[in-house]
Design a protein with these regions (language model features):
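Amphipathic alpha-helical coiled-coil "transmission" helices that mediate dimerization
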Residues: 162-201
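Regulatory sensory and allosteric helical modules in signal-transduction proteins
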Residues: 14-15, 45, 51, 55-61, ...
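A short, aliphatic-rich beta-strand micro-motif
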Residues: 111-122
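Allosteric cytosolic regulatory segments
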Residues: 148-155
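Short beta-strand-to-loop transition segments that serve as allosteric relay/switch motifs
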Residues: 128-137
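Helix-loop-beta substructure at the N-terminus of cytosolic sensory domains
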Residues: 23-56, 71-72
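Glycine-biased flexible loop/turn sites that connect beta-strands or occur in inter-domain linkers
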Residues: 48, 123-124
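Signal-transmission linkers at sensory-effector interfaces
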Residues: 1-28, 173, 187, 194-197
Length: 202
């Protein structure tokens, strides 16, 4: 079953784009967080998944070769519908939302999923830090809390990234303004020089 769109989909996608993280190269900061999530939850697979308009893209992953999947089969597309809660699916073959999902019915045969939403300060769900297994199971309360804490760490790093991007943009604008001022100054000096030449000639 394909997940419905969040009520704030337009603002959510705009917020995701503002972080400028889609299709970027792997970074050890995020790779470390999925390794920790996998270890704490005891799952073979952990992902940082960002839900774009028609796909989910993985900023970091362990236990999975793919870098993205179609949004219509994404468990995380369901998780972002309620950004304040972890979506837990103990056995996907017994959940009407996922039983016919090709990632469940076919390869890789997902059975268990838990996704902690990545939530902006404004409340938009960008994606999840999620863990998956290929046998039915569940997480202990302390594992769920740890998954949420790690998801907050992901968002803190994304926020820092966004602030750095904003600072760099501001610096580029300042540099552009300085170049324009320098060009204007040179133009004034040239005009002044030409005026002096004409005055001297006259």
């Amino acid at each position: 079953m394909q997940a419905p769109l969040p009520h704030n989909e337009g603002a959510r996608v705009a917020a995701l784009q503002a972080y400028r993280v889609l299709d970027t190269l792997p970074e050890s900061t995020y790779d470390d967080l999925v390794q920790i999530a996998s270890a704490i939850c005891g799952t073979p697979t952990a992902l940082i998944s960002l839900v774009d308009t028609d796909r989910q893209w993985f900023k970091a992953r362990v236990g999975l070769d793919s870098t993205e999947t179609s949004r219509d089969v994404a468990f995380c597309a369901h998780a972002i519908l309620n950004p304040s809660e972890v979506l837990t699916v103990p056995d996907a073959t017994k959940d009407a939302r996922f039983v016919e999902n090709p990632l469940v019915a076919g390869d890789p045969g997902i059975r268990f999923y838990a996704g902690a939403p990545l939530v902006t300060p404004e409340g938009e769900g960008l994606g999840t830090l999620c863990v998956m297994d290929y046998v039915p199971r569940n997480l202990e309360p302390h594992q769920l809390l740890s998954l949420q804490a790690l998801a907050r760490q992901v968002m803190q790093h994304l926020e820092m990234r966004r602030e750095i991007e904003r600072t760099e943009d501001a610096l580029m604008n300042v540099e552009g303004s300085l170049l324009e001022m320098e060009a204007y100054q040179r133009s004034l000096e040239q005009s002044h020089h030409e005026l002096e030449v004409r005055t001297t000639t006259d």
